[in-house]
A protein has these predicted regions:
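Glycine-rich phosphate-binding loops of nucleotide-dependent enzymes
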Residues: 1-190
Length: 190
């Protein structure tokens, strides 16, 4: 894998995060959150060991709580408080917690895998806005989606895969919705 033109050797997740990789997983409940943890704890899953959230081996709870309150407000997470378990939130608010966490630190590459699957229209629009903000701030975005409208509205370039192989790469401005659908279904080769 290369990031900013530099070869990145195999790294554990902590090293990837420290090198600017952020990830919005396809399955938010299985891979994105610890459902029994509070929103505050979920917001620092990737950075709990770093200042201002820790000093040595001691966690700095006031900083963790303040971070959560700030992200709840900034990302419009609908919750009675930062100590609510993530499992008590709606799907849209769970996704906002993940997006807040992943975009609250410097991001060089955002991998967004099915970022809006199963969400309401308002949450979809909000997640799309945050992806665009990250892109406009200079982050590279790898969007993985089966939603044609999402792909066409957020992408600069589109690579279509079928059975694990890239079958076409095109500029989004040149993409045709029906052609993309055929390529995704394996009915047409570029």
């Amino acid at each position: 894998m290369k990031l900013d033109g530099k070869v990145m050797p195999f790294m554990n997740p902590r090293h990837l995060v420290e090198h600017g990789l952020s990830h919005i997983p396809e399955d938010r409940q299985k891979h994105g959150l610890v459902m029994s943890y509070s929103i505050a704890d979920n917001e620092v899953l990737c950075t709990y060991y770093q200042p201002p959230f820790a000093r040595g081996i001691q966690r700095m709870f006031p900083a963790i709580v303040e971070n959560a309150r700030s992200l709840i407000k900034r990302f419009d997470v609908r919750t009675p408080g930062e100590q609510v378990p993530a499992g008590n939130l709606s799907g849209g608010n769970q996704q906002k917690v993940i997006v807040a966490r992943e975009l609250s630190r410097p991001v060089r590459l955002l991998v967004a895998n099915q970022p809006t699957r199963g969400l309401d229209v308002g949450s979809i629009e909000y997640i799309h806005q945050q992806i665009v903000v990250a892109r406009d701030a200079g982050s590279a975005v790898l969007l993985i989606s089966a939603e044609l409208d999402e792909i066409l509205s957020l992408s600069d370039r589109i690579a279509v895969m079928y059975h694990g192989q890239i079958v076409a790469i095109m500029e989004a401005s040149q993409a045709d919705r029906s052609e993309l659908g055929l390529l995704m279904a394996g009915s047409k080769k570029a």
